[in-house]
């Protein structure tokens, strides 16, 4: 994807990398990882097995009633536009969304969060609303949430709430880091690579929307 990020993100990434190295090399520290892949990598590079464990994110899954589907008319991004997130949203708006709208012309893309107004472009059916001031999530019914993360680097806590609320979403592999892959069901929780992101969303839109109970 030929990504470039600004100096702020580079600075934070460098600081986090140095801290991670300090923790890994500390023989008195007990390491807790958020995914089995991270744990396996640590054990591979260090040869240590007794000073580490994994605590994966396991939200409580709601009961889903697969009743008569309703059509989905909106894609939703819920989150601020920080420097590294902007790269992901730019990629989605410029590369992914046109493919989706070419297949399903009536679909709209709505963004809520800090600095999302910069994307407001009604002529392209893109609506940047700014901060969401209400409780819960915007436009839950008749909407599909998207998490087009192309950088990764941490657990996306909003996914935790989407999972527990039974709100359908499509995420990149990077955006699902730290979560148990057993939760992926290809209906309410879809995870795919960047190459097939548009196709996964189109397929999910054609499935319709299912109510949760």
Predicted regions, residues:
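Short hydrophobic beta-strand element within catalytic cores of glycosyltransferases
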Residues: 158-161, 168-174
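Membrane-proximal helix-turn-helix segments that form the acceptor-binding/catalytic region
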Residues: 2-31
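Acidic donor-binding loop of glycosyltransferase active sites
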Residues: 139-154, 165-167
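Conserved acidic donor-binding segment of nucleotide-sugar-dependent glycosyltransferases
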Residues: 187-195, 203-209
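Conserved catalytic-core segment of nucleotide-activated headgroup transferases in glycan assembly
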Residues: 44, 54-140, 191
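Short acidic/histidine- and often glycine-rich active-site loop of Leloir-type glycosyltransferases
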Residues: 173-188
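Helix-loop-beta element that forms the nucleotide-linked donor phosphate-binding surface
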Residues: 23-31, 39-59
